[in-house]
Amino acid sequence: APILFGSSFMKEGDFQLMGVFGGTSFLGLTWIGEVDIAENWVDDNSSLASFSEFSYPVKQGLHFVVRYDLFDEDINIKNNAISRWTVGADVFPLSFFEIKLQGRFTSLSGDGENPEPEYLIQFHTWF
């Protein structure tokens, strides 16, 4: 199974961003993920952002996708993170054309009320 792993770093003034990313594929199931820590992006806080995605080609032109995203604007404060599960399908009916069908389910940590689910249809083309 092919494996990809890497890291990134950026510093500009007081702002600093560093992260790791990776991915692998086995028997058609593909995983990609990334974790980043930012210093001084939101005020003077240390922030954390991450995502993890699994994709599986059911047949040519149809992929099922499950993704988890997390953003914590201040890792030193408990219960201030936003997380989201995304479930959907990527349909490729023609070359260079994609239709994304997704349901997004967002959760706020702490005692806050969670937002209603979001449903997305996106048309995407490239060249």
Regions found by a protein language model. Give the residues of each.
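Outer-membrane beta-barrel strand-turn architecture
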Residues: 23-28, 56-60, 91-97, 127
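Outer-membrane beta-barrel architecture
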Residues: 21-23, 53, 88, 102, ...
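Outer-membrane beta-barrel "beta-signal"
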Residues: 115-127
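Gram-negative outer-membrane beta-barrel proteins
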Residues: 11-15, 39-43, 72-76, 107-111
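Transmembrane beta-barrel architecture of outer-membrane proteins
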Residues: 17, 47-49, 84-86, 118-120
